[in-house]
Amino acid sequence: GDGECDEPESLGAISLAGRENLDNLIFVINCNLQRLDGPVRGNSRVMDEFEGVFRGAGWNVIKVVWGRLWDPLFEKDKKGILQKRMDEAVDGEYQNYKANGGAYTREHFFGKYPETEAMVKDLSDEDIWKLNRGGHDPFKVYAAYHEAVNTTNGKPTVILAHTVKGYGMGSGDGEAANEAHQVKSMEYEALKKFRDRFGIPLTDEQLKDVPYYKPEEDSPELKYMHLQRERLNGYLPSRRSDFEALEIPSLEDKAFASQMGGSKGREISTTMAFVRILNGLVKDKQLGKQVVPIVPDEARTFGMEGMFRQLGIYTAEGQKYEPVDKGQIMYYREDQKGQVLEEGITEAGAMSAWIAAATSYSNNNVTLLPFYIYYSMFGFQRIGDLAWAAGDLQARGFMVGGTAGRTTLNGEGLQHQDGHSLIQASTIPNCRSYDPTYAHEVAVIVQDGLKRMFTDQENCFYYLTVMNENYEHPELENVPADDIVKGMYLLKETKGDKGRVQLLGSGTILREVEAAAELLANDWGIGADIWSVTSFNELRREALLLEREAFLNPDAEANKPHVTKCLEGRDGPVIASTDYMKLYADQVRAWVPSDYTVLGTDGFGRSDTREKLRYFFEVDRYFVTVAALRALADRGELDRKQVGEALKKYGIDANKPNPLTS
């Protein structure tokens, strides 16, 4: 629609089609000149505007402006006066002509010049009102489609069809009126006019019930429609939900095994762990060609530039120049057979490419494994509509939020520091989201996700946060893969004889939690069970599922959610700490079987070091330690004076700014 083209997403990337020479692409824009509330361009002419925009972007433009009933008048227009009158009228006037009928049009349109007034002197007001617009003339529309389909000059084509909003409702009954979209039903007399206008075979009596009219199966109309659908290889809407299951490598295979044994003393980030897994997948003989890495001009940020030479960057034209870094190992290689989609600085464009790949199993019967990696702050916050659409379209693939965590991406300020993408991900019912800390967690989640989506064919897609902070990754004797997928597992335990607490953490803040456990043990004699929570979102969803089952089956024994089973029977209060808003961890409070304290990063980001940011947002090891001591004191298991001593010991200023409001 012409009104919808005010959305940046509608026209913002049309030059791409011109650059890619997509001469099989045809847009049809219904130019009825109206939005919901009023004219699209009341003071100008929207079709002329669109013509300029599309021609400038390298498109063919076909304008279907006037119907056949105007042709006799055009034949009379020897001096171009009618053409002049049409060119000078603005869209707000054209809306009036249709809304107010033939007499109004005779006076205000044709009546401006004697020559045009004379052209219609033999036409009745009804004849003038019936002068049709091109988009409602099947002959003109067919001619436009024929030209569009048969034009093969390497350019995409747009058809601008001039129409009337509420066409068929009748003058005075909603046609071309500003309130056309709000007319919920038509009066009986208006229905009769509609019936007569379009030749619908219903009697006056039948019309009173406003029946749904469908032509007979052997009617010319339905025969034609069925024939055309056969020529187009099927009917719409249609959704292919089943496809040939893929065999996903196991955790023992090379792509994942390299990340299961820790970092062997090296300090790496979870981003690096993810990229290594991705590199392993693209080298897989079975799956490699189906993997689609997608980046919005951030490949070097995430250490993915090695894929430029290895896989090539897709471009329709190949590479007509020698890149400036050709002498380097990881040079910028563009190729017609490239596999990396380098979309430039457009998260909406990159997300759209991801959706196309993530729905290819259904739309094209070709299963692809898309991985879209980007700055996490520029994900759901920027392209939330598209992420919601991806859920609706049953997309399957991975969205990977890089440089995640409000205090982990240091030095880039509030516009870049993400403390809420996981909360936004939780709003999409079929989006499974995780915030891993260690490489083995990343490996387990990616492998499980691939299996769920492409072997088991579950209707879901994944959001995975990865960070840019380097640290050593542990090697676990037995990686609890099932618990990692469920959202929570016991990482380690520390000893203490003066009390015990349960410490939960996710992402990079889990490492602050681990450090806090050492402080509690060494400084206060407090022991701790340390839990890695890979997904508070998954914990909550499972708990809600079981809660519903219990509600609907009151006579059956209720199953306990994973978070409850993990913490049940464990000593001490529970303290959860994350690099996200407190709401993220707080969402499981109802199923935590103990006193529950949540630390998080509510508030705007700041540009500073990680150490100072974590102090500012009150999620560093010292705040975790004091929160644990305070929780014990509230239970009467610790002298409250020790909480004050801890604040002094760790240099925590009671008068520091509140991160939520400062």
Regions found by a protein language model. Give the residues of each.
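Short acidic, Gly/Ser-rich segments with clustered Asp/Glu that frequently serve as metal-coordination loops
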Residues: 3-9
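Thiamine diphosphate
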Residues: 11-474, 481-482, ...
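Short glycine-rich or small-residue beta-strand-to-loop segments that form or flank ligand, phosphate
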Residues: 1, 339-342, 370-374, 500-505, ...
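Conserved catalytic-core segments centered on acid/base and nucleophilic motifs
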Residues: 3, 351, 357, 502-504
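Short intrinsically disordered, low-complexity coil segments enriched in acidic
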Residues: 1-3, 310
